[in-house]
Structure formats: C-alpha cells, structure tokens
C-alpha cells in the first residue's frame, strides 16, 4: 500500500480499489485514476464496461449510486470524482494532490468544483471519445461560452500560480486531473485554443499516466453509440 498518511484516522491499509467505466468514454473515471497514478498511490482497478449487459447491477455491487467512479477504501465507499480526490488528499497529504500554498489551494479547489458542476454544453456536444479521429464539430453558443470560460481558467491559474511547472498550479494537482478529460475533448474535436492553452494541453498529454490511459482506451472493444457523435461520417479508430 502506498503511503501511511491515514494512520491517525483509523483507516485500514487494505489495497485501495477504484471502480471505473470504459477508458475511452468515462471522463469521470479518468479523473481519480489519473490523479492516483501521478501521485504514486497504489490501487487495484475494477473496470466495468458501461451499457454492456447488466452493467448497472455490476456497478451497484460496488457503488451505492450505480455510477462510476467509486473508490473502495477498506469498509469505506467514496463516490463522485471530486469527493474521491478530496478523500485521497486527506489520506495521502504528502502526495501533493492540492497545492501547498493556501491561496493556490483555494483557487485549485474552486476551479475543480466549477469543473465538477458546470460546462454541461461541452459535455453534451463534445463527449469524451479518445478513439474518435480528430475532427471538429460546430460549437453552439453555449458550448463556445464554456470553452471561453475553460480557457480563461487555465490562463488565470497559469499566470497567477503556474511558475513552478507546466500545470495549472505549477506541479500537477487534482485540478489538472479534473480538467484532463477537457483536454481530450478539445483535442478530439479540434477546438481552437491559444498558444498557452496548447502548451498546457501538451503537458497533460505528455504525462506517462495519461499516455497509459489513452493506450488502454484505444484497445477497448466496446462502442457506446451515444458517444459516437457524427457516426458513421467520422469513423471510430480501430
């Protein structure tokens, strides 16, 4: 088990398990998975293909909501991506999941929560699909406003707190994990971004953990047609 930071909280030291959905499509699953990998937190992965057979019952055996992701930590069940990240930050305070500086940490939590709660137009119009060839989609006014706000967040965080590295707050943090699926969406749908945003996206995409997730996603056999927008005009990569 990586780390022993939970000793004072009475947490068990059984191996953590992270229940996730398809790596090609499940943006919510990607967030804690990526954070745990980058932070060096050991865990077992339980992947349940979404919309495949009796997937809901399979998820309910782990998660009370019937949704992914869900972190199993001994007798604890922690669901919702942001709640999982907060739990991990408490469990492993030495792993840098949030910035050490108080002002940066408050900002990181704010933008992570905004990502968790908002940007519904981008979610609907540009579903995460790593196997989709790069091809643009026309943005609705709502989606364009979402994109503008994301770019403003990235710019502000980088300008104010990003001097120590290529990520939003310098070093990789939970905030970057929350925005990583947006990076994939902007790449997949060829969303126009400025030079600074492009550099940030490249930094996220260069992470070994990101590359490992994407490589696994491209090998998955499952297809969720609702996420295959412009199908069959834009054919999924095999």
Specify the residue positions occupied by each region the protein language model found.
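GST-like domain detector, emphasizing the conserved glutathione-binding G-site
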Residues: 8-140
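A short, structure-level motif marking secondary-structure boundaries and short turns
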Residues: 16-19, 70, 168, 185-186, ...
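Conserved beta-strand edge residues that scaffold enzyme active sites
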Residues: 50-52, 200, 218
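Phosphate-coordinating loops and pocket residues in cytosolic domains that bind phosphorylated ligands
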Residues: 61, 206, 215
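GST-like fold's C-terminal all-alpha helical module
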Residues: 119-211
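Acidic/histidine-enriched, glycine/proline-rich intrinsically disordered or flexible terminal extensions
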Residues: 217-238
């Amino acid at each position: 088990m990586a780390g022993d930071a939970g000793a004072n909280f009475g947490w068990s030291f059984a191996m953590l398990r992270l229940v996730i959905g398809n790596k090609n499509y499940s943006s919510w699953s990607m967030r804690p998975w990526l954070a745990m990998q980058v932070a060096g937190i050991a865990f077992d992965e339980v992947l349940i293909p979404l919309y495949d057979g009796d997937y809901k019952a399979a998820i309910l055996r782990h998660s009370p909501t019937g949704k992914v992701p869900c972190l199993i930590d001994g007798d604890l069940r922690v669901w919702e991506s942001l709640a999982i990240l907060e739990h991990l930050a408490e469990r492993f305070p030495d792993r840098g999941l949030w910035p050490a500086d108080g002002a940066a940490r408050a900002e990181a939590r704010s933008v992570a929560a905004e990502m968790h709660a908002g940007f519904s137009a981008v979610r609907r119009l540009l579903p995460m699909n790593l196997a989709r060839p790069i091809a643009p989609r026309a943005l609705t006014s709502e989606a364009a406003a979402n994109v503008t706000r994301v770019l403003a967040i990235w710019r502000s965080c980088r300008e104010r707190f990003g001097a120590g590295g290529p990520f939003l707050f310098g070093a990789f943090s939970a905030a970057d994990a929350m925005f990583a699926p947006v990076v994939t969406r902007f790449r997949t749908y060829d969303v126009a971004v400025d030079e600074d945003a492009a550099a940030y996206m490249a930094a996220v995409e260069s992470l070994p953990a990101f590359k490992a997730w994407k490589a696994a996603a491209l090998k998955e056999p499952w297809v969720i047609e609702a996420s295959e927008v412009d199908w069959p005009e834009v054919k999924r990569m095999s």
